[in-house]
């Protein structure tokens, strides 16, 4: 999710294990990307005494060729392999039938270790926000990062699926605090984050240090908002919350709000934001 959003041309795995051991890893990768998948296994694992790898060229080719059945388009070898291994793999692949992948990826966001699929209502914890919270404002002014982390841990324990992060306060350097907070949060929780700010530079700084696919909160129908927020969303492969309001405020009629929502969707899609 993260790499495809960032514009990678292909994703995959190399080294670490032999071809048989990498099959479940590759199966999972294929579930979550529409990009070409690359696989370069080791020739098994090295013997600790001889440093020789335990999979022969023919065994390697027989096992690695199974990846073509998963729709893998790029195959090679890593540690322990040699031209002899690649020759055996090429010969084996010439007799195999490549199976094209059909992937239907749901809307989802992720951290470095946790994916939240947006296929039903999700709980977003909103406690990391100074609005109406005197103690939180004090924590921001005093650079009390531990208090902020405590709020994250409590919300995770209470069942939040995603954590909103807002550190906007007139008396502080919001950009610096946002970067510090996002980095620190990733050390105590694996929940995906929602970056919440009205300042484009703050949003981009947060996405720059975030290890995953975040949500941006938010964009609206104002031309200025569309022109400044959506390019950042596109650049970092984020998801984004769209607010049905514009230069004239919040429309009273549902039909007018729908038109704003459609405007946001059309602009996002024209930029290649899914």
Please state what every model-predicted region is:
Residues 1-274:
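Domain-level signal for soluble alpha/beta catalytic cores
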């Amino acid at each position: 999710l993260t790499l495809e959003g960032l514009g990678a041309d292909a994703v995959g795995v190399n080294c670490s294990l032999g071809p048989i051991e990498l099959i479940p890893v590759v199966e999972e990768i294929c579930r979550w990307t529409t990009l070409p998948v690359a696989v370069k296994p080791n020739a098994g694992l090295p013997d600790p005494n001889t440093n020789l790898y335990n999979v022969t060229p023919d065994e390697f080719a027989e096992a690695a060729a199974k990846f073509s059945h998963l729709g893998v388009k790029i195959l090679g070898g890593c540690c322990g392999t040699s031209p002899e291994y690649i020759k055996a793999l090429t010969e084996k692949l010439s007799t195999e039938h490549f199976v094209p992948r059909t992937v239907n990826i749901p809307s989802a966001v992720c951290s470095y270790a946790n994916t939240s699929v947006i296929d039903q209502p999700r709980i977003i914890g909103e406690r990391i926000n100074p609005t109406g919270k005197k103690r939180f404002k004090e924590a921001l002014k005093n650079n009390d990062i531990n208090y902020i982390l405590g709020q994250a841990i409590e919300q995770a324990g209470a069942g939040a699926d995603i954590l909103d992060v807002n550190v906007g306060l007139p008396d502080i350097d919001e950009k610096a605090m946002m970067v510090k907070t996002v980095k620190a949060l990733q050390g105590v929780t694996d929940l995906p984050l929602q970056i919440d700010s009205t300042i484009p530079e703050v949003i981009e700084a947060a996405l720059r240090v975030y290890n995953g696919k975040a949500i941006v909160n938010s964009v609206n129908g104002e031309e200025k908002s569309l022109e400044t927020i959506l390019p950042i969303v596109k650049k970092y492969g984020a998801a984004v919350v769209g607010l049905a309001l514009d230069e004239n405020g919040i429309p009273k009629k549902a039909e007018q709000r729908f038109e704003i929502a459609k405007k946001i969707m059309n602009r996002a899609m024209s930029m290649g934001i899914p």
